[in-house]
A protein has these predicted regions:
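Conserved ABC ATPase signature
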Residues: 134-138, 142-144
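Conserved ABC ATPase "signature" region
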Residues: 67-70, 112-130, 181-182
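ABC ATPase NBD coupling module
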Residues: 69-84, 108-111
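Conserved H-loop
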Residues: 188-194
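A short, proline-enriched helix->beta-strand linker immediately N-terminal to the Walker B motif
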Residues: 153-157
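Helix-to-loop junction immediately C-terminal to a conserved catalytic motif
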Residues: 52
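Catalytic Walker B motif of ABC-type/P-loop ATPase nucleotide-binding domains
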Residues: 159-163
Length: 228
């Protein structure tokens, strides 16, 4: 099953500026973890914002789980796209406990099922003992795990991660990368990881795509990762 399909996507911050993303096409299958590499300003983070519905393209089509979410005459709101996001700063609510941070994204789930889902997510990221803690009481790696649990809790079709390791020191980054790959594959989660660090994609991704001046891609310029 194709989980994300993008055709001829073009985006500019204004009509007077050159496109940040120009005629970009791409597809990925369910369960794949894809890395997006590129220099600053190449449109990596903008691509995630377009997929999630936080930006509107000039032209092009995006499908998520075979549902069209944007094209010339259609725009599905972000909350109805089945997309989960983990941001660079994790965006946890400081006044909420770990449990309440995860519960926040489950408002559409029947109340009787919410506690079970929180418990499942805490077990998945191995943070069961931190359920009553607040974000400021957690390390950077622990905060990232909770951000991941919150993003996965509503069962999104696709998870988007924007520079998820940039706030971690080198030693912690290496261990967290390994943990993240295990968690994503255990959850059979399709994921796009934006990063400037090739080591990130080599550690967890099935293949990578480099965004550059033309921002055009096809199957021939994907680089598939080799995992032990």
């Amino acid at each position: 099953m194709t989980i994300v399909q993008i055709e001829n996507l073009t985006f500019s911050f204004s009509r007077k500026q050159d496109p940040v993303i120009n005629d970009f096409s791409f597809s990925m299958k369910k369960g794949e973890i894809v890395g997006i590499l590129g220099q600053s300003g190449s449109g990596k983070s903008t691509l995630l914002r377009l997929i999630s519905g936080l930006e509107m393209p000039i032209k092009g089509m995006i499908k998520i789980a075979e549902m069209t979410v944007v094209d010339e005459g259609l725009f599905i709101q972000p909350e109805n796209r089945g997309v989960g996001m983990v941001f660079q700063d994790y965006a946890l609510f400081p006044h909420m406990t770990v449990k309440d941070n995860i519960l926040f994204g489950l408002s559409r789930m029947p109340r009787k099922d919410r506690k079970q889902r929180v418990d499942e997510m805490l077990e998945l990221v191995q943070m069961e003992q931190f359920v009553r803690r607040y974000p400021h009481e957690l390390s950077g790696g622990q905060q990232q795990r909770i951000a991941l649990a919150r993003a996965l809790a509503p069962k999104p079709n696709i998870l988007l991660m924007d520079e998820p390791f940039s706030n971690l020191d080198a030693d912690l980054k290496e261990s967290i990368r390994e943990e993240l790959g295990v968690i994503l594959r255990k959850a059979n989660m399709s994921c796009i990881v934006v990063t400037h660090d090739r080591n990130d994609v080599e550690a967890i991704c099935d293949y990578s795509i480099v965004m550059g001046p033309s921002n055009q891609t096809n199957d021939s310029n994907r680089k598939r990762m080799q995992h032990g």
